[in-house]
Amino acid sequence: MQFVLSWVFLVAILKGVQCEVQLVESRGVLVQPGGSLRLSCAASGFTVSSNEMSWVRQAPGKGLEWVSSISGGSTYYADSRKGRFTISRDNSKNTLHLQMNSLRAEDTAVYYCKK
C-alpha cells in the first residue's frame, strides 16, 4: 500500500508587518511504507548556517507539528522522528535537508522548512 507524502518548502523573513517569501516549492510524492525520501530547501536572502532552521509539518486535518531543528552544530528532533529523520545543511549551497527513512503512513503531511 502506498501513501502520498506532500511538502511545501517555505522560507520567510519578516520585515515589519510584511513577509517576504524567499522560496516556495510544492510537490507530491508516492512513497512505499518503509521507504526513504530526502527533502531539500534552498534559501536566498540570508545564510542558512547563521540561523536556526527547522522543519515542521501539517498532517491532513491537523495543526502544525514540529519535526526537527538545526542550530550551530546541534540538531533536535521530535521523539517519534529520532533515529528515522536526519536534518542537515549544505553551507556551500545554502540549503537545508531532511532525510526521512523508515517512512510510515502517519508521516503523510505537508512539510515546511522555516527560518
From Swiss-Prot:
Region of interest (Complementarity-determining-2), ranges: 70-75
Gene label: IGHV3-38-3
Binding partners and assembly: Immunoglobulins are composed of two identical heavy chains and two identical light chains; disulfide-linked.
Keyword set includes Ion transport: no
Signal peptide feature range: 1-19
Name of protein: Probable non-functional immunoglobulin heavy variable 3-38-3
Subcellular location: Secreted; Cell membrane
Keyword set, alphabetical order: Adaptive immunity, Cell membrane, Disulfide bond, Immunity, Immunoglobulin, Immunoglobulin domain, Membrane, Secreted, Signal
Pfam hit, one: V-set
Molecular-function annotations in GO: antigen binding
Region Complementarity-determining-3, annotated ranges: 114-115
Gene Ontology CC: one annotated term: plasma membrane
